[in-house]
Amino acid sequence: MLLDEYMPVYDVSDSVATLVQADVATTWDALMRVDLVDVGRRRPLVGALGALRALPDIVSHLLHGEAPPAAPAALRLRDLAALPMGQGGWVLLGERARDEIALGLVGKFWRPVIEFRDVPADRFRAFDEPGFAKTIYALGVRPVDDASTLLTGVMRTATTDDDAHRWFRRYWTLGVGSGAHVLVQGLLDVTRELAEAPTPPSPGPRTG
């Protein structure tokens, strides 16, 4: 598992799973196609949590006379690796087709305006600069049978020293853990809906 390769030891973890009535290939394709912006629209609580977390950063930009970065019209999991750090960007730690994808982030998440560190995948596991937390989200598919798939989302966070551990624990116990759970559950639910949606019939040959 990519999770164990990059973060075998961690402070907190959360996991979500949902059963999808579709095969692994269809479910994986849906996971890669799901629009994260659309998840916020389909699941209002997910959208509200995202907007709430982004608010301090927006205010900070405005106070400095800067325009906040424009929100993308659409955003898929692989797109996160192309975004700048601090503007929604994540590090793609690894992807195994039709199996799992893992994304990582390093920062002081407990601050109203998060201080990020841009840490490449090959340095992610060893990163130990004091005062930071490292988070991984891993999403995976596992066959149940030929026509159904278990879709999973697992989050792990590790801190780099005692001070960061204390700060992160306070942040986590304020309800951030529940919020993270809701966000991933929303992503999995919309992925399931996409995977289970009937395939439109191919147009037949023209006649006449």
Feature-to-residue mapping (PLM):
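Beta-strand/loop substructures that line and gate deep hydrophobic ligand-binding cavities in soluble
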Residues: 122-178
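Acidic, Ser/Thr-rich low-complexity intrinsically disordered segments
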Residues: 204-208
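Hydrophobic-ligand binding "helix-grip"
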Residues: 82-146
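A conserved amphipathic terminal alpha-helix motif
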Residues: 167-203
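Short, solvent-exposed loop/turn segments at secondary-structure junctions
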Residues: 25, 36, 107-110, 156-158
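A short, polar/proline- and glycine-enriched secondary-structure boundary/capping micro-motif
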Residues: 39-40, 112-116, 162-166
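Intrinsic-disorder/low-complexity, polar/charged segments enriched in Ser/Thr/Lys/Arg/Asp/Glu/Gln
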Residues: 11-19, 100, 134-136, 148-152
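Hydrophobic ligand-binding cavity/cleft-lining segments
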Residues: 1-90
